[in-house]
Amino acid sequence: MTPKLLILLFFLGSFFLQAQNLVWKTNMNDAIKMCDDERKPLLIFFTASGTSQKIQSEIFATPDFMDWSSENIILLKLDLSDPSISSEEKEQNVKLKEALGIDELPQVCLATASIRRNKPTINKLGMLEYKMGGAKKWISEAKIILRGE
């Protein structure tokens, strides 16, 4: 192989390995506890099989999103079509979706989450959809929501 091709493969491999380092919680209770412990807001990604994957490939899989999310938020991915979760957990996820006003998938909701008197509380801050413009633009919109503007 030519050196240029090897260098290109190295950088592409590094990018994909880095994108896989995102730590998504898939259990709502675990994510709420982590938010409460770390005092960080929650990014809830509602998805299902057959929905567009653009937000994942063009936003979540970028180094910019990885850097920002690791420092600023707790990631929770709720796949409403996941056959491996219990019916109780699936029902809990659907109730959360309805309570937050999520009516189409995929959808991202930013929220605060805490535990008071052993009861979890989630307060919706705002919602974000996929928009063309890249991760930096998406992150700046998320920051506006998180600041309450």
Predicted regions mapped to residue ranges:
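Bacterial Sec-dependent N-terminal signal peptides
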Residues: 1-21
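A short beta-strand-turn-helix
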Residues: 24-41
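Short, solvent-exposed loop/turn and secondary-structure capping segments
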Residues: 54-57, 88, 120-123
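Short active-site neighborhood of thiol/selenol oxidoreductases, capturing the structured segment around
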Residues: 38-52, 108
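Thiol-based oxidoreductase modules, predominantly thioredoxin-like and allied folds used
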Residues: 21-26, 47, 65-91
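Typically the conserved alpha-helix immediately C-terminal to a functionally engaged Cys/Sec
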Residues: 32, 53-70
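Extracellular/periplasmic catalytic domains that process cell-envelope and extracellular macromolecules
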Residues: 36-37, 67-70, 100-104
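Non-catalytic, surface beta->alpha helical segment in thiol-disulfide oxidoreductase systems
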Residues: 99, 103-149
